[in-house]
């Protein structure tokens, strides 16, 4: 019975139990699904300067550089504690070992530092002889070989304290350790710039013999460097040294330049390569010595020079080694400094042959380039280019390592599924553009991570990139092929668990949550943080395999509520308790190129990746995803153009110049050689050529028809043009030449004239508007040229004619005699176009000129002004005006036919600032203006009571103008004038004094240094009826000029028959003298005229067919040639002979009878002559500067009009242009190649000059010492009988030995003075000398503390002479600013008062601070070493000083600079003191490189925004 109630009880509870069980089963999964990520907040006093994870571990370090403390977490940032040891308050730098996963270093600013070998758990103290140096790179360089990870190079900063006044000078010293600082490191090398191990990266295939090798950039002579640093200079040239025994012995790395391998600027690794940069003293361009050369090594033994396409200039601080691959180097070279754009080049697998990949890349002034490779994805990279679209920046993506580029395909819908109003097929107006490296707001890689295929970015859809706060956030899960918008507004983002978790946080405003997605961005959830903050950094472990993240942010005081304002939030998505993915949750994901399913870099790369909808986590922590590859057959897409080839319009790779023929090949035309096919496989491409096409295989080519002469012989080839040649244009430093024909066609040769092809726009000319009117070479950019048509289309090249494009202009070119194109000196894309409107018919009533400008190389135009005569950029190479200013000659009355305008319609000179938007009338009426070097000269039309006339003005800044003063009796009036030259800090001007037709001449005037006061240099200087003057400066030697003078002015004014004589100056017009004639002619016979007055006379500038022909050469220093005669006057041209000088015109010799045209080649080692009196079928050439001549016959007789070669005269190939006998309607070009006459390259050995092929030569005036312009300057020139060719451009001058003592040759007549018959400078009758300007002398940079009364002479502006005779100085007076002008008591009183006042102010400040509440409390900002110095760097006094407006400090700096100039010459100790207190590293330079490139990275610790 008792059991019945029990049974009944069970029956009652059973339903309840079942209900509970079912409820539990239902509730538990729901609870599991609802589980969210964990959030843990930690607070810190300051933001970190670095957050560093130990690879493949959960340990992370947080470096607070402000407090000098390093914190450590063992659980990926959940909990934190300061590291052990005594580094607290002293940690200035945290340096993880890049290869050893357990080592890290804490560096202080002093000598004591700390090392950990157990991921920061314990720290051991170690000492270094000097504190760390970060001037030229990181202070520690690590050996990359696993057996040598404890081998470290440490660079320290050594400073010397001296004098009671403080101050110091510093230099870098290198030390090394082979046991990770277990013992004190010994010194490696003193006075270094930077050192690297030969095994600098794990990828480098360093030879076994070079594993212990160290490379250092250092000064060859440490003592010389020490002396130069004390003197305030940069010292001797840096060189690259190597050592295999820690510099117990060392060897200079000569590369292939011998002892010219100097002035190294950088050294650093890039994946498989070690790269060094130095100044290229043996380049083939005219900029040799100013450009940089790159050398590359893969094994630490053999260095090879990197070769770039023609016209690519590597200037110091103007290139960046960017995020390269393991199989090639990518370098971005500055293309436009002011527009911050570059050209991206990619190398072959050797790292030496570079081809252009992308033009117009966006870069910052600091050298950061908007380019990044996607992590773990072969061949895919994203770059930004500058454009004229809205926003100005467009994003491009490559899927073949830069061989081709495409725009990013935008999504069709926004994050809410709403259709975006944009047509993706219109890539020009509808593309995705992303913020890149230059706008980086997070740490680590910008776009991608190890998570395969995942790419995120912040950007906009449209024509171009918008401001960051106008952007949205986008995601791609297929390596950039397609994109989707995942959120409005800009966000920071991070990837976790190989892409299973995506996290992003608002990057525009404060936020209290993050968003995350576990299904590849399909849906997003919010995770509350529990605090409101401004996100600074979002990061996770480097391999993105963890489910834990760190979010660093900062709060306002109100948000923090009195707590520390910087928060580190630990986000733990492992707490979501998702299951571990199984094999069925994974899929094979292929990296696809732009075309669906296609191969990428010659293979199909794939990863195992979680399926997008799989509800699991991979949870394979610390294990990077491994890629697999399926090989593909080679296709056209797997090849790119080889070095020296570019793609034409049909997409084929064609040679850009002379094709390289192997040395020794082509001994005769019937031979063959193996040459490039024009293609090479894209570096890193692994396609199977056996199963596809092979385009990179060397091909057998015939020597027949190749421009390769047989050894010891000359090669020629003729080409007949269909019309007469009327103009030519040779691109500097190239083999590209253009000729324009009379029929309006243009022909081009890319191989110095060996072969020619006609240039057409889009096929054959179809109308008269397609005729070419003229050619224009960019005045400042040697790579650019323009072909102007009769219509509104202009063809242009940016690569010296290798390829051509076109742009449209708003109006046809003007036919009003006005310059059509004007070029900006600094910004190659900035153009001014002057066209004509309504000028089609001669009877047009409103015909006028209009000027337009473009800042996009013709892509877009803006109107400047109408009815103008000239518009040009105000800025010039030496006239440093605002870059956007424009000068225009603009007519006052803007109506009517401009062709019929008279002086009644005034021509105003307008300066338009901000691209002519703000206009200022500079002069009411002008005749014209022109810029000459640093001088802007304006001819103003003035009307006086007597008669109208001209007044010249000059300006050095384009704003302030001063009238030009001529000698007495020389009033310009309406006389003609010609501004001739201004390269030697003075203007030469020809003032016409006799303008009768047939007997024109004038006076040659020369200005002072600011162009205002002119003195007579030479009278009766010849000119012609067009205003051209027989005046020519010698190229390569400053101050040497040749003129022709009318010797019979009285007779010539009546007979109009001028007798000309030649004069030369070697001191810039200070004195003129006759040309010393040779004693005998070319046959050794004496001249008929051999008495006093029998001089050498040469035909000058006014008689030349082509004004571009010159006496001298820019590269053959000291050489000049001319046609003339020995006698009492210049004989007719056909009665003249040919003469040569080797020493700048001091002595001459006759080299051939009869008049000849001439041209220099190979920097003067070859001279070519052709008869200029009659038709000829041969040329003469000399390989020994005219000692002997050889004749070469080229075939049919022709009347030669021109000898053409590259403008620098550095080639051994020439073009003869002429007309055949009996034909006056067609021109013929004869190609001549002399390169096989000499096979040995001249040797320049600085160490053993007696054993090389060059001699040092110094031009000399008529004085006891060898000086020119008061300076002894040495030039290299090939020995006259050396059997070799020069080759690369020699940097001239070689050296400046010293400044010479002043002599009479360094002075010229002062204003209002002239030279009388005795050569003495005398005052013009009835005038007064200029008054003395004492102030300008006393405040001049070279003032000696005195001012001097004027005399009858002045020092030639360009003379460098010092001391010696100074006839320009009269009575001496002490300057008022001279310290010697005051006595000892005066200076004692002034200095004492200053120190007393400073002491009172300091005492008052200290008392005030000590009485302030809270002074010295914990809230005060302290120095990193926690000191409490009142006048420390971060003291409140300094902070207040920092708030003073900059112009006040600028004024103080200017005053101090002025004081230094005075005091350094007055007080003995002040000179050295002021020179030495120039900061710790005055005189050193930084090499601008990419942050992500290993080559000299900026090793500042400011990785995070503060």
Curated annotation (Swiss-Prot):
Any GO CC annotation of this UniProt entry: membrane
Record keywords: Glycoprotein, Golgi apparatus, Membrane, Protein transport, Receptor, Repeat, Signal, Transmembrane, Transmembrane helix, Transport
Extent of the BNR repeats: 71-82, 114-124, 396-406, 474-484, 516-525, 795-805, 1181-1190
Membrane topology: Single-pass type I membrane protein
Membrane side Cytoplasmic: residue ranges: 1405-1506
Main location: Golgi
Annotated SUPFAM superfamilies: Oligoxyloglucan reducing end-specific cellobiohydrolase
Parts of the chain on the Lumenal side: 35-1383
Domain of life: Eukaryota
Database matches in Gene3D superfamilies: 2.10.70.80, 3.30.60.270, YVTN repeat-like/Quinoprotein amine dehydrogenase
BP GO annotations: Golgi to endosome transport; Golgi to vacuole transport; protein targeting to vacuole
Glycosylation sites: 1010, 1299
Subcellular location: Golgi apparatus, trans-Golgi network membrane; Prevacuolar compartment membrane
Segments passing through the bilayer: 1384-1404
Cleavable signal peptide: 1-34
Stated family: Belongs to the VPS10-related sortilin family.
Function comment: Functions as a sorting receptor in the Golgi compartment required for the intracellular sorting and delivery of soluble vacuolar proteins, like carboxypeptidase Y (CPY) and proteinase A. Executes multiple rounds of sorting by cycling between the late Golgi and a prevacuolar endosome-like compartment.
Protein name: Vacuolar protein sorting/targeting protein 10
Species annotation: Mycosarcoma maydis (Corn smut fungus)
Gene: VPS10
């Amino acid at each position: 019975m008792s059991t019945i109630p029990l049974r009944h009880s069970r029956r009652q509870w059973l339903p309840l139990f079942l209900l509970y069980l079912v409820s539990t089963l239902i509730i538990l999964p729901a609870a599991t699904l609802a589980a969210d990520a964990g959030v843990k907040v930690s607070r810190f006093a300051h933001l970190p300067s670095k957050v560093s994870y130990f690879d493949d571990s959960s340990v992370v370090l947080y470096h607070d550089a402000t407090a000098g403390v390093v914190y450590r977490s063992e659980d990926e940032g959940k909990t934190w504690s300061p590291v052990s040891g005594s580094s607290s308050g002293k940690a200035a730098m945290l340096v993880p070992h890049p290869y050893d996963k357990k080592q890290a270093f804490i560096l202080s600013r002093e000598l004591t530092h700390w090392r950990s070998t157990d991921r920061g758990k314990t720290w051991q103290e170690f000492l270094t002889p000097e504190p760390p140096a970060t001037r030229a790179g990181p202070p520690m360089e690590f050996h990359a070989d696993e057996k040598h990870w404890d081998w470290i190079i440490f660079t320290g900063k050594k400073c010397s304290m001296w004098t009671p006044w403080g101050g110091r000078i510093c230099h870098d010293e290198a030390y090394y350790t082979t046991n990770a600082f277990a013992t004190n490191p010994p010194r490696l090398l003193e006075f270094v710039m930077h050192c690297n191990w030969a095994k600098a990266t794990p990828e480098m295939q360093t030879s076994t013999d070079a594993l212990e090798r160290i490379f250092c950039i250092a000064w060859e002579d440490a003592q010389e460097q020490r002396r130069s640093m004390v003197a305030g200079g940069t010292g001797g040239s840096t060189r690259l040294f190597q050592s295999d025994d820690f510099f117990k012995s060392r060897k200079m790395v000569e590369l292939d330049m011998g002892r010219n391998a100097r002035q190294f600027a950088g050294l650093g690794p890039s994946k498989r390569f070690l790269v060094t940069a130095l100044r290229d003293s043996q380049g083939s361009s005219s900029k040799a010595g100013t450009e940089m050369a790159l050398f590359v090594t893969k094994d630490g033994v053999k260095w090879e020079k990197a070769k770039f396409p023609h016209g690519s200039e590597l200037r110091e601080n103007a290139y960046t080694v960017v995020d390269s691959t393991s199989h090639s180097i990518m370098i971005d070279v500055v293309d436009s400094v002011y527009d911050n754009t570059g050209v991206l080049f990619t190398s072959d697998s050797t790292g030496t042959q570079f081809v252009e990949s992308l033009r117009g890349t966006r870069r910052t002034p600091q050298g950061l380039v908007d380019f990044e490779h996607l992590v773990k994805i072969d061949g895919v990279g994203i770059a930004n280019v500058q454009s004229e679209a809205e926003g100005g920046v467009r994003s491009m993506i490559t899927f073949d390592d830069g061989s081709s580029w495409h725009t990013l395909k935008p999504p069709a819908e926004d994050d809410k599924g709403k259709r975006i109003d944009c047509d993706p097929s219109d890539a020009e107006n509808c593309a995705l553009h992303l913020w890149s490296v230059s706008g980086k707001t997070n740490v680590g890689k910008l776009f991608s991570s190890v998570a395969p295929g995942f790419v995120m970015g912040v950007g906009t859809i449209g024509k171009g990139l918008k401001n960051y706060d106008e952007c949205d956030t986008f995601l791609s899960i297929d390596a950039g092929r397609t994109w989707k918008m995942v959120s409005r507004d800009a966000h920071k983002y991070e990837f976790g668990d190989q892409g299973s978790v995506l996290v992003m946080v608002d990057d525009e405003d404060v936020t209290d949550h993050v968003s995350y997605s576990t299904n590849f961005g399909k849906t997003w959830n919010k995770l509350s943080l529990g605090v409101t903050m401004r996100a600074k950094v979002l990061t996770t472990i480097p391999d993105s395999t963890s489910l834990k993240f760190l979010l660093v942010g900062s709060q306002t005081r109100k948000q923090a509520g009195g707590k520390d304002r910087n928060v580190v939030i630990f986000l733990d998505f492992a707490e979501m308790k998702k299951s571990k993915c199984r094999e069925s949750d994974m899929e094979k994901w292929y990296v696809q190129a732009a075309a669906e399913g296609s191969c990428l870099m010659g293979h199909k790369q794939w990863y195992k990746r979680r399926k997008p909808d799989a509800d699991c986590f991979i949870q394979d922590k610390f294990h990077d995803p491994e890629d697999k590859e399926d090989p593909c057959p080679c296709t056209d897409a797997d090849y790119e153009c080889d070095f020296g080839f570019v793609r034409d319009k049909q997409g084929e790779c064609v040679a850009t110049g002379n094709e390289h023929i192997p040395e020794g090949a082509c001994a005769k035309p019937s031979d063959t050689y193996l040459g490039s096919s024009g293609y090479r496989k894209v570096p890193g491409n692994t396609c199977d050529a056996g199963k596809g096409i092979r385009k990179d295989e060397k091909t057998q080519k015939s020597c027949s028809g190749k421009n390769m002469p047989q050894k010891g012989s000359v090669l020629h080839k003729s080409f007949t043009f269909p019309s007469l040649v009327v103009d030519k244009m040779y691109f500097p430093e190239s083999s590209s030449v253009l000729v324009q024909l009379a029929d309006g066609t243009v022909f081009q040769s890319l191989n110095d004239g060996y072969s020619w092809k006609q240039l057409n726009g889009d096929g054959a000319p179809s109308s008269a508007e397609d005729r070419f009117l003229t050619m224009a070479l960019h005045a400042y950019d040697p790579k650019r040229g323009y072909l102007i048509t009769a219509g509104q289309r202009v063809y242009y090249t940016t690569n010296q004619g290798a390829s051509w494009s076109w742009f449209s202009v708003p109006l046809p070119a003007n036919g009003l005699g006005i310059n059509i194109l004007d070029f900006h000196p600094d910004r190659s894309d900035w153009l001014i176009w002057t066209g004509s409107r309504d000028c089609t018919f001669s009877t047009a009533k409103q015909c006028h000129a209009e000027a337009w400008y473009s800042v996009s190389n013709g892509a877009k135009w803006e109107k400047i002004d109408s009815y103008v005569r000239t518009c040009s950029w105000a800025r010039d190479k030496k006239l440093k005006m605002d870059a956007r200013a424009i000068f225009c000659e603009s007519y006052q009355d803007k109506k009517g036919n401009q062709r019929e305008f008279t002086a009644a319609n005034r021509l105003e000179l307008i300066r338009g600032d901000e691209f002519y938007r703000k206009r200022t009338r500079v002069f009411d009426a002008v005749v014209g203006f022109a810029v000459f070097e640093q001088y802007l000269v304006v001819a103003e039309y003035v009307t006086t009571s007597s008669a109208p006339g001209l007044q010249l003005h000059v300006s050095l800044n384009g704003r302030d103008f001063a009238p030009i003063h001529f000698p007495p009796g020389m009033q310009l009036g309406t006389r003609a004038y010609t501004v001739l030259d201004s390269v030697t800090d003075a203007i030469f001007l020809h003032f016409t004094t006799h303008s009768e037709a047939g007997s024109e001449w004038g006076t040659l005037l020369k200005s002072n240094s600011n162009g205002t006061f002119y003195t007579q240099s030479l009278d009766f200087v010849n000119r012609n009826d067009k205003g051209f003057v027989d005046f020519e400066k010698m190229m390569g030697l400053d101050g040497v000029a040749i003129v022709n003078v009318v010797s019979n002015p009285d007779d010539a004014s009546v007979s109009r028959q001028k007798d000309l004589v030649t004069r030369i100056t070697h001191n810039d017009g200070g004195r003129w003298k006759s040309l010393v004639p040779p004693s005998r002619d070319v046959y050794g016979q004496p001249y008929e005229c051999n008495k006093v007055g029998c001089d050498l006379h040469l035909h000058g500038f006014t008689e030349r067919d082509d004004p571009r022909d010159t006496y001298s050469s820019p590269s053959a220093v000291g050489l000049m040639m001319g046609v003339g005669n020995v006698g009492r006057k210049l004989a007719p041209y056909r009665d003249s002979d040919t003469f040569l000088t080797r020493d700048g015109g001091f002595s001459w010799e006759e080299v051939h009878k009869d008049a000849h045209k001439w041209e220099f080649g190979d920097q003067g080692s070859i001279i070519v002559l052709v008869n200029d009196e009659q038709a000829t079928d041969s040329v003469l050439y000399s390989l020994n500067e005219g000692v002997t001549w050889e004749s070469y016959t080229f075939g049919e007789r022709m009347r030669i009009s021109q000898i053409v070669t590259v403008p620098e005269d550095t080639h051994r190939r020439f073009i003869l242009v002429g007309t055949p006998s009996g034909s006056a309607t067609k021109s013929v070009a004869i190609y001549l190649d002399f390169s096989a006459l000499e096979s040995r390259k001249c040797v320049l050995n600085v160490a053993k000059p007696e054993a090389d092929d060059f001699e040092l030569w110094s031009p000399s005036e008529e004085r006891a010492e060898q000086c020119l312009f008061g300076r002894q300057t040495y030039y290299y020139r090939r020995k006259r009988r050396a059997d070799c060719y020069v080759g690369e451009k020699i940097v001239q001058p070689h050296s400046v030995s010293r400044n010479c003592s002043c002599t009479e040759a360094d002075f010229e007549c002062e204003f209002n003075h002239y030279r009388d018959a005795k050569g003495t400078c005398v005052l013009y009758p009835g005038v007064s000398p200029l008054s003395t300007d004492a102030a300008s002398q006393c405040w001049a940079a070279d003032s000696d503390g005195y001012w001097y009364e004027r005399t009858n002479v002045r020092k030639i502006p360009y003379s460098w002479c010092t001391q010696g005779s100074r006839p320009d100085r009269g009575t001496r007076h002490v300057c008022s600013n001279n310290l010697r002008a005051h006595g000892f008591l005066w200076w004692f009183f002034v200095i004492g008062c200053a120190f007393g006042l400073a002491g009172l102010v300091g005492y008052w400040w200290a008392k005030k601070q000590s009485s302030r509440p809270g002074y010295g409390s914990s809230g005060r900002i302290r120095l990193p070493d926690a000191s409490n110095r009142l006048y420390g760097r971060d003291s409140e006094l300094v902070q207040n000083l920092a708030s003073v407006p900059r112009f006040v400090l600028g004024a103080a700096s200017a005053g101090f600079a002025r004081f230094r100039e005075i005091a350094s010459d007055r007080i003995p100790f002040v000179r050295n003191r002021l020179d030495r207190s120039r900061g710790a590293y005055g005189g050193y330079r930084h090499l601008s490189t990419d942050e992500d490139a290993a080559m000299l990275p900026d090793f500042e610790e400011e990785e995070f925004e503060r």
